[in-house]
Amino acid sequence: MTSQPGAVRPFDVTSRSVLAIAVPMTLAYLSTPLLGLVDTAVIGQLGDAALLGGIALGGVLFDIVFTSFNFLRAGTTGLTAQAAGAGDGEEERAVLFRAVLLALVLGFAVIVLQQPALTAGLWLMGGSPEVQAATTSYFAIRAFSAPLALANYAFLGWFIGRGRAMTALGLQTWLNGFNIALSVLFVLYFEWGVAGVAAATVAAEALTALAGTVLAARALSGRPLPTRVQVFDKVRFKRMMALNGDILVRSFALITAFAFFMSRSAAQGDTVLAANAILEKLFMVASFFLDGLATAAEQLAGRAVGARYRPAFDRSLKLSLVWGYVLAGLISLVFFFAGPLLIHAMTTAEDVRQVAIAYLSWAAATPLFGVLAFQMDGVFIGATWSRDMRNMMLLSLALYFAAYAVAFPLLGNHGLWLAFTVFLAARGFSLLAITGRRARETFPALPA
């Protein structure tokens, strides 16, 4: 049933409602790196370094592709949450159809353009002829997972936007579980090598897309499907494309920031590069936890905007930040005190260990400096204030480069970490600074 347009729909936001989304999504995000470890382990059993290098390079190429298309998940979450908050069932259903349609179009484009994409990727990343041959084999098969993988982004975003975090967790667990099982089966038992890892991914994405379709059909059971006119509504389709475009630019800026960090690390020599790579992995682990709370902020802020209910928006912002800082503080303490043990577990090279420990304090502080960026990104995605998020990301990237230009000549690798910290902090505080104004514009009839 669709409510009257513009009607205020009050609802409560509590710590329980925040954690009900954050905890399942954190578990879902944490299951993803396990897949990479298993793929590496099963190929490692074949005893061929070129095969390991092949799936590593292929994995990086697809990480870039799918990270770029993450707007399908994030944008769908925000639009669905707003439709749910407004009680607009027709639009809520239409968002899913638009997102899946766009996912399929983009996915088939990846298949069509796979050869030039692979050629460009190999040119940029290099590798021995043996590694490039393995990468080519992996890429040629896994490319066919693109329409399925992107459709799964759409399903995931839609269920999260509806507040169905446990369903999203189930889909992600289903995907990674099947992928792991099939990788072991295809590589170790069928002896398909790198092709087996790629085929396992295609099969797992297909099974997950099927599961997502079934679950979505159940959710839509008994309700009228959106008409062609509703799905292709020019204004709403244009809004979705603008939102996705802004998130895409933001994603490219984020990729650029991390690529710059690693390139500047490499310029300092292999030891510093290895040490910084280990410390960056610690930050990435923290990001999986913080992303869970950011996803909760997306859904609740989006729902509040759709419901036109400012108190729920303010409450979702406050609670997600409180829980975010609590979690970030705990992670920072773990990294600070257990960091040396983690570093020793990740490398046996003594020189790398010493350098990593020397800069550990920076990595331990990144969750505290970055949590505001994660949470504000979630709020702005949910509220679909994507243009502001894009602009503040570009501003933060410029400040990052400026900070590096000043700090690195004076402080060396400490200066690089300082610049990265400035980047994280700038993202969060720049968005926070304009939140009040954007909220007043979005909730004009309600007191601040």
Placement of each model-derived feature along the sequence:
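Short runs within selected transmembrane alpha-helices of multi-pass transporters and secretion channels
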Residues: 70-73, 141-160, 168-176, 197-213, ...
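Helix-terminus/linker motif at the lipid-water interface of multi-pass membrane proteins
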Residues: 30-53, 122-129, 185-192, 248, ...
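Alpha-helical transmembrane segments of multipass membrane proteins
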Residues: 37-41, 120, 154-158, 180-185, ...
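Small-residue-rich hydrophobic transmembrane alpha-helices
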Residues: 52-112, 152-168, 275-339, 371-384, ...
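Interfacial/gating helices of multi-pass transporter permease domains
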Residues: 43-63, 129-137, 194-195, 199, ...
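Short alpha-helical transmembrane segments in multi-pass integral membrane proteins
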Residues: 1-22, 80-147, 178-181, 187-248, ...
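Transmembrane helical elements of multi-pass membrane transporters/channels
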Residues: 20-39, 141, 152, 175, ...
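Residue-level hotspots within the lipid-embedded alpha helices of multi-pass solute transporters
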Residues: 29-33, 67, 107, 111, ...
